[in-house]
Structures are given as C-alpha cells and as structure tokens.
Amino acid sequence: MKRFLLFVNRRKERADEKAKAIREQLLRLGAQRVDIEDQSTQGITALDYDCVVTLGGDGTLIRAARGLAGSGLPLAGINLGHMGYLTVASKDAEIPRVLDKLILDDFTVEERMMLCGRIVRNGHESPRDREWLALNEIVVSRKSSAGPVHFCIYVNGAFLNEYKADGIIISTP
C-alpha cells in the first residue's frame, strides 16, 4: 500500500502530534501519499487511497467504517482511546510494526459485516426516519416515559419475529 488517509479524532489527547508522526513515518517507509482528515469521509474512494488508518478509538473506527461502507477500502485502527477492541495497535511500540506491515502489504483483511437498520412506524416511513449503518449493533429503545414498544423485525425484507419490549439490540454475528 502506498496511498493512505489518516482519519483523526482530534478530541483525543496528542492526536495531532501522533498523526504528524505517523504521516512522517509512512512517507519515510515509501508511501506516495498520506493525507490527514478529521471531519468527514464523504467523497473518499479507493481511487484516491489504498488504506484508511484511523487514529482515535473504536468510535472513530466505527464512524469511518460507516462513512466508507461499500468503498472497498481497508481500515486499520490505531487506538488513542480506552477500549481499542477493534483497533490493530494500542501502544506506541506497536505502531511502527503495523505501519511496516501496511507498506509491505503484509497483513490479512478481516471482512466485517455491517448492519443497515430502518424504522417504520405504523407501516409508513416518516420523513424523520432514515437508515442507519452499524459495524457492531443497532440499539432501538423506547422514550423514557413511554410503555413497552411493539417491534416487528424483518431481515432482508422477510419477517423474522415480533417482540414487545423496552428496547431491542440487533447485532452482527
């Protein structure tokens, strides 16, 4: 891989400093292009980049995955947060090894399923309803003052089941 986008959560401590250091290291290793972005993944395609490296936490990686869904671009997360469950590097000492592997194409892409959820009320989609993309799960819950909600669950347009509950969590396997 030679063309990288660093997608940075600037609210994380030392994020700018880390992004600049990683950019410099990738260029030293032979990267042809390393851009830094912190706002949006809109318009980013596989024509421009070979890989997106997120700097933040799991939330940053999930936000990038949602924005890049369908692009075919691989994501590699560097954890600057607390959990780092989805990231490939959580400690400063791990970052050089990860960058080397990316430059040398010495890695395995783990395909992750994403969910697309939509809420339909009383058989009709209202203008305020939209689709949500999720990497892990979609949580739908009632308003705090309301009673239980009646959920009819469909998967790919086929009825699955119905539930009466305070909320429901639909997750990837």
Language-model region placement:
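Short glycine-rich anion-binding loops that position phosphate/pyrophosphate groups of nucleotides
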Residues: D58-T60, M83
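Short glycine/serine/threonine-rich phosphate/pyrophosphate-binding segments
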Residues: T60-A64, T172
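N-terminal glycine-rich "phosphate-gripper" loop used for MgATP/nucleotide binding
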Residues: T54-D58, R66-G67
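Short glycine-/acidic-enriched loop or helix-start segments at secondary-structure transitions
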Residues: D16, R63-A65, L86-T87, H150
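Catalytic core of DAGKc-family lipid kinases
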Residues: M83-G167
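Divalent-cation-assisted or electrostatically stabilized phosphate/pyrophosphate-binding catalytic cores
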Residues: N79
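Proline-centered loop/turn at the N-terminus of a beta-strand
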Residues: G72-P74
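ATP/NTP phosphate-donor binding region
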Residues: M1-C51, L55, K91-T108, I119-W132
